[in-house]
C-alpha cells in the first residue's frame, strides 16, 4: 500500500489568524489541498492524517470538539471522493508533552504498526518544522515542507523538498515514489 503521512492544520486547512482551528466556522480548506488529495488517490496513494492539537491542552477545545471539527472536514472533502485511511491526533503541549506529539515519532510509528507500513517508503508532509522532524525521527523516506501556513517556517534545512502548496507536494510524491 502506498501511503503519505499528512499534517492537517496549515497543510490541508488554513490556520486561522489566532492559530487554532477550534470551531466549525474556522474550517477553510485550501483549494489545492483537495486537488492534491485527489491526485494522490488517483495515483493509488492512501493518506494518513497525523496532527498535533495543542488547543486541547490549552483548554481551547475538547477532544470531542476536535472530532466534530474533523468530521466536518471529512464532510467537506466527501464530494471530491477524498478521505483518510486513519487519523492520529495528539492534544499535548509544553514541557510535559510525550513522544506522541510531533516532532516525536510515536503517532507515525503507531500508524506504521496499525496499517503494516514500511516507513522507509513514506513521506511526511506538513507546514511546520515539527512535521518534517517527526518524519525523520520515525525513519520516513523524507519530509516535505508545504509553505502554506500563516506565521510558520518557510524553509526547512531537513526537508527533502519545499512545495508552494499541497498539490505541488502531491505531484512530487507521485513522481518520486
Q: What is each residue range found by the language model?
A:
Residues 12, 57, 61, 128:
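Gly/Ser/Thr-rich beta-alpha loop segments that engage phosphate groups in nucleotides
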Amino acid at each position: 500500500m502506498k501511503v503519505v503521512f499528512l499534517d492537517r492544520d496549515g497543510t490541508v486547512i488554513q490556520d486561522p489568524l489566532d492559530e487554532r482551528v477550534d470551531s466549525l466556522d474556522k474550517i477553510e480548506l485550501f483549494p489545492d489541498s483537495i486537488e492534491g488529495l485527489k491526485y494522490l488517490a488517483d495515483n493509488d496513494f492512501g493518506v494518513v492524517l497525523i496532527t498535533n492539537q495543542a488547543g486541547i491542552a490549552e483548554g481551547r477545545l475538547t477532544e470531542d470538539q476536535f472530532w466534530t471539527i474533523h468530521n466536518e472536514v471529512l464532510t467537506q472533502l466527501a464530494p471530491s471522493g477524498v478521505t483518510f485511511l486513519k487519523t492520529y491526533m495528539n492534544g499535548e503541549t509544553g514541557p510535559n508533552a510525550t513522544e506522541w506529539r510531533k516532532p516525536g515519532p510515536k503517532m507515525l510509528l503507531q500508524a506504521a504498526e496499525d496499517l503494516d507500513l514500511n516507513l522507509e517508503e513514506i513521506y511526511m508532509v506538513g507546514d511546520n518544522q515539527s512535521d518534517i522532524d517527526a518524519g525523520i525521527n520515525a525513519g520516513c523516506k523524507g519530509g516535505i515542507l508545504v509553505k502554506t501556513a500563516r506565521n510558520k517556517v518557510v524553509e526547512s534545512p531537513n526537508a527533502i523538498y519545499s512545495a508552494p502548496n499541497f498539490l505541488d507536494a502531491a505531484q512530487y510524491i507521485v513522481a518520486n515514489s
